[in-house]
Curated annotation (Swiss-Prot):
Organism phylogeny: Eukaryota, Metazoa, Chordata, Craniata, Vertebrata
Protein name: Neurabin-2
Chief location bin: cytoplasm
SUPFAM superfamilies listed in its UniProt record: PDZ domain-like
Subcellular location, record wording: Cytoplasm, Cytoskeleton; Nucleus; Cell projection, Dendritic spine; Postsynaptic density
Gene name tied to this protein: PPP1R9B
Length: 817
């Protein structure tokens, strides 16, 4: 992810990749500060204060570079006097990424390391004459000096093609001559420096001792702090390092050629096979470095500390030391480049001074580590100059893990490119600008995030062929098995369990199951096979059969072998923390079925063995051999299975060792070994004694319990006899009650019959009563009707009597008259 910010004169610069930052830092470090641009006038020297380490490095390079003889001066004296700037040399210390170290490196220690490297590089020159001695050497100047003088003479007229061709020829000769003088350093860091190889057949290496001092001192150092009053010299992040490579370079400013296409493969990244010396020198016309910008990347980092020499009144040699540190952080990589200037002063003048290095922030880009008094226009001036690699000497150190220490290889097609005029591919040199983001129309005033509209620089990187993306060492079956186990753990219900491990252990047995177990891949899941009755797990009750053991005391048991899991469980002590995975309710996996089948198979095998032992037991019974109770008491069957005790056993067939025949060292070694075995055996005997004592106590407890049980059995027998008497009485009572019940049942049946008969009679009487009532009602009606008829007849008779009496009266009256 690239972070774009508006670039101002004081704003932070950006870089696109660690490769590019390393290249730009090298270019900026090798530019003389007094060199103006093509269309600007030269400016005054930068008045900076430098530390003593920089002066020492510069003095060493001056010793190496000012040993030219009269024969060399005859042809190149004028060139030395007229050269506007001298050739430059740098020593690069490269510390690539490694996982075993993560520590801060002191800047002063790295500068001391650069000083020792410069001493090593000075041995390339065959003349040991110091710079202060103007006496002519006893033999003609070396090819390195001739090459340097040729570069100085060709600096004013860099456009001349014939001088460039002559320089290329001399470089090829120098490359062939320096192949046998290549330096190899192998430094192995396993927490500290262990093994070192020789640099040369006759060269002693103080560099390696300083390296070890740097990394050992960095263990107790938590950070780097800049001292008061000193300019910021470098930003040194945390260093992870197993590899150290130092490069000595001589640069020449030829005319700038067109930039190479970004798709070319970098030839210098390929390694030559062991035993071959690759060509170490090349002419690399460099392109103008683009403006660095701030970049945040998670990649291996290359941090360069380059010493820039202060411009002097007369044009002279400029010696620069360049230290490159590949730093890989644990949480990501940062890019930080800093330049520490190195003026020409006597080494002994500022020897006790210490120059502190300030820690650069992770997001700072290339150029942020420069001294604060450097003006932006001076930086732009130095960026306009072009440099090319004229000489390259690699001092490589590898981690010693079976790799070659032959250094980096330059292929033969580099020479063809140089002859054809094509510049070699530089992966850090090319970039393309694309339009940035468009202006926002109406940004919210309260928003805190603003996007830059500056152009975006797109940097080229290495092609795919340069990266090793092969995975032949990955076993697909093992990887898929582990993947399936991890997916299975995600589907399980996880919960923690803590158990207290007692003398009988944890009370569980395990079984490993997983894909690829039959092919020896051993990417297994560890499941609970059985839970011992009465053990710690059984008393706790949370761990069940078929549960998956995910972790034990923080150690993951997913995708491990069964032996590893068993050793982890054996080594636990005291309170043991488990992470248990269990199938969710309603889910039935094939693991439970497999464990069940395994248990059934073991049960079947146990039954077969018991049958065999039963046959042997029958034979023993025929011979009259019986086991006594004492034997049974001495050999109890524990619920946790048989007790497995590991004891170191000496080989029985081992020959008797004679102290006279053996050497004292072997005797001491054998004695220590026997002491260890004796101590282990004593510990196991003590453990067995403790277990035997606990078993004796348990045996006494069992005897007491047996007596109590026998007494309770006698009491229960008496109770049983009483209960039997009660039961007989109850039986007779039950028989009497049964007879009475039968009689009562017979009476009940007779009464039932009488009741039914009476019920029928009652029904008959009720029917007859109904009929009688009906007859009574009919007769009453008939009587009422006859009464009415008789009454009417009486009324008629009475009327007739009264009528007759009247007639009689009238007759009497008439008669009387």
């Amino acid at each position: 992810m690239m972070k774009t910010e508006p670039r101002g004169p004081g704003g932070p610069l950006r870089s696109a990749s660690p490769h590019r930052s390393a290249y730009e830092a090298g270019i900026q470090a090798l530019k003389p500060p007094d060199a103006p641009g093509p269309d600007e006038a030269p400016k005054g020297a930068h008045h900076k204060k430098y530390g003593s380490n920089v002066h020492r490095i510069k003095s060493m390079f001056l010793q190496m570079g000012t040993t030219a003889g009269p024969s060399g001066e005859a042809g190149g004296g004028a060139g030395l006097a007229e050269a506007p700037r001298a050739s430059e040399r740098g020593v690069r210390l490269s510390l690539p990424r490694a996982s075993s170290l993560n520590e801060n490196v002191d800047h002063s220690a790295l500068l001391k390391l650069g000083t020792s490297v410069s001493e090593r590089v000075s041995r390339f020159d065959s003349k040991p004459a110091p710079s202060a001695q103007p006496a002519p050497p006893p033999h003609p100047p070396s090819r390195l000096q001739e090459t340097r003088k040729l570069f100085e003479r060709s600096a004013p007229a860099a456009a001349g093609g014939d001088k460039e061709a002559a320089a290329r020829r001399l470089l090829r000769q120098e490359r062939a001559g320096l192949q046998d003088r290549k330096l190899d350093v192998v430094v192995r860091f396993n927490g500290s420096t262990e093994a070192l190889d020789k640099l040369d057949a006759d060269a002693v290496s103080p560099t390696v001792s300083q390296l070890s001092a740097v990394f050992e001192k960095a263990d107790s150092r938590t950070g780097l702090h800049r001292g008061p009053g000193l300019p910021r010299a470098a930003g040194v992040p945390q260093v992870n390092s197993k590899l150290v490579s130092k490069r000595s370079r001589v640069f020449q400013p030829p005319p700038p050629p067109p930039p190479a296409p970004s798709g070319d493969a970098p030839a210098e990244k390929e390694r030559c096979p062991a035993g071959q010396q690759p060509p170490q020198h090349r002419v690399a016309p460099a392109r103008p470095p683009p403006k660095p910008r701030e970049v945040r990347k998670i990649k291996p980092v290359e941090v360069e500390e380059s010493g820039e020499s202060e411009a002097e009144s007369a044009p002279g040699e400029v010696i620069q030391a360049e230290v490159t540190v590949h730093a890989a952080l644990e949480n990501g990589s940062t890019v930080a480049t800093a330049a520490s200037p190195a003026p020409e002063e006597p080494k002994a003048q500022a020897a006790p001074e210490k120059e502190a290095a300030a820690v650069a922030p992770p997001e700072r880009g290339v150029g942020n580590g420069r001294a604060p008094d450097v003006a932006p226009e001076e930086v732009d001036e130095s960026k306009k100059e072009d440099f090319s690699e004229a000489d390259l000497v690699d001092v490589s150190a590898y981690s010693g893990l079976g790799e070659d220490s032959a250094g980096s290889a330059l292929e033969e097609d580099d020479e063809d490119d140089e002859e054809d005029g094509e510049p070699p591919y530089e992966p850090e040199s090319g970039c393309v600008e694309i339009p940035g983001l468009s202006e926002e129309e109406d940004p919210a005033p309260s928003r805190k995030i603003h996007f830059s509209t500056a152009p975006i620089q797109v940097f080229s990187t290495y092609s795919n062929e340069d990266y090793d993306r092969r995975n032949e060492d990955v076993d697909p079956m093992a990887a898929s098995a582990e993947y399936e186990l991890e997916k299975r753990v995600e589907r399980l219900e996880l919960f923690p369990v803590e158990l207290e491990k007692d003398s009988e252990g944890l009370g569980i047995s395990i079984i490993g199951m997983g894909a690829g177990a039959d092919m020896g891949l051993e990417k297994l899941g560890i499941f609970v096979k059985t839970v011992t009755e009465g053990g710690a797990a059984h008393r706790d009750g949370r761990i069940q059969v078929n549960d998956l053991l995910v972790e034990v005391d923080g150690t993951s048991l997913v995708g491990v072998t069964q032996s590893f899991a068993a050793s982890v469980l054996r080594n636990t002590k005291g309170r043991v923390r488990f992470m248990i995975g269990r199938e969710r309710p309603g889910e039935q996996s094939e693991v439970a079925q497999l464990i069940q089948q395994t248990l059934e198979q073991e049960r079947w095998q146990r039954e077969m063995m018991e049958q065999r032992y039963a046959q042997y037991g029958e034979d023993d019974e025929e011979t009259g051999e019986y086991a006594t109770d004492e034997d049974e008491e001495l050999s109890p069957t524990f619920p946790g299975g048989e007790m497995a005790i590991e004891v170191f056993e000496l080989a029985e067939n081992e020959d008797a060792l004679s102290p006279v025949d053996m050497e004292p060292e072997k005797l001491v070694h054998k004695f220590k070994e026997l002491q260890i075995k004796h101590a282990v055996t004593e510990a196991e005997i003590q453990q067995l004694k403790r277990k035997l004592q606990s078993l004796e106590q348990e045996k006494g407890r069992w005897r007491v319990e047996k007596a109590q049980l026998e007494q309770s059995v006698e009491e229960n027998k008496e109770r049983m006899e009483k209960l039997e008497g009660y039961w007989g009485e109850a039986q007779s009572l039950c028989q009497a009650v049964d007879e009475h019940l039968r009689e009562t049942q017979a009476q009940y049946q007779a009464l039932e019959r009488k009741y039914s008969k009476a019920k029928r009679l009652i029904k008959d009487y009720q029917q007859k009563e109904i009929e009688f009532l009906k007859k009574e009602t009919a007769q009453r009606r008939v009587l009422e009707e006859s009464e009415l008829a008789r009454k009417e007849e009486m009324d008629k008779l009475l009327d007739k009597i009264s009528e007759l009496e009247g007639n009689l009266q009238t007759l009497r009256n008439s008669n009387s008259t």
